[in-house]
């Protein structure tokens, strides 16, 4: 099953970027490699229930099983011992990646209260984009009655663009609503 955004990339976005940046080869055109959704859950060190609910929510949002991250070393100030669960993440590629990106652009971001667009300043020098969301309720898969606490997440869109200008052009063509 090919995703709408995947088809859009090959039929419309790729030719536009070839024309804009005058690439000589189709393989030079930047593309989205993967999307990583990360959620730090520091309270998981004290309560396993928090970690399980966070993992379940991430599974619902992404459509894929998440991975538990563990602390590398003990930090007394944060009351964390070594190898204690401190977060969850999931890496999306292929059709699931395009499906998530489509839902993020068309369903989740417009549901943010007083949404003005996302900042174009969050690109690194390699054309990857990072976005922080403050709550999980913007995703239609999450029901308000079934969450125990509002928790945010970090979303990293990894591209193979050579610089931030190419990455911005790619994500604008996909329809990400950047502030003007």
From Swiss-Prot:
Q: Does the keyword Chloroplast apply?
A: yes
Q: Does the keyword rRNA-binding apply?
A: yes
Q: What is the lineage of its organism?
A: Eukaryota, Viridiplantae, Chlorophyta, core chlorophytes, Chlorophyceae
Q: Name one Pfam family in it.
A: Ribosomal_L5_C
Instruction: Give the UniProt subcellular location, in the record's own words.
Output: Plastid, Chloroplast
* Functional note: Binds 5S rRNA, forms part of the central protuberance of the 50S subunit.
What do the Gene Ontology cellular component annotations say? Answer: chloroplast; ribonucleoprotein complex; ribosome
Record-stated family: Belongs to the universal ribosomal protein uL5 family.
Q: Name one GO molecular function term.
A: structural constituent of ribosome
Q: What InterPro entries would the database entry show? A: Ribosomal_uL5, Ribosomal_uL5_bac-type, Ribosomal_uL5_C, Ribosomal_uL5_CS, Ribosomal_uL5_dom_sf, Ribosomal_uL5_N
What organism is recorded for this protein?
Stigeoclonium helveticum
By its UniProt entry, which SUPFAM superfamilies does this protein fall under?
Answer: RL5-like
Q: Could you name the domain of life of the organism this protein comes from?
A: Eukaryota
HAMAP family found in the cross-reference section:
Ribosomal_uL5_B
Question: Subunit info?
Answer: Part of the 50S ribosomal subunit; contacts the 5S rRNA.
Q: Which PANTHER family does the record match to this protein?
A: 60S RIBOSOMAL PROTEIN L11-RELATED (PTHR11994)
Keywords, A to Z, come to: Chloroplast, Plastid, Ribonucleoprotein, Ribosomal protein, RNA-binding, rRNA-binding
What is the protein name given in its UniProt record? Large ribosomal subunit protein uL5c
Q: Which is a GO BP term held by this UniProt record? A: translation
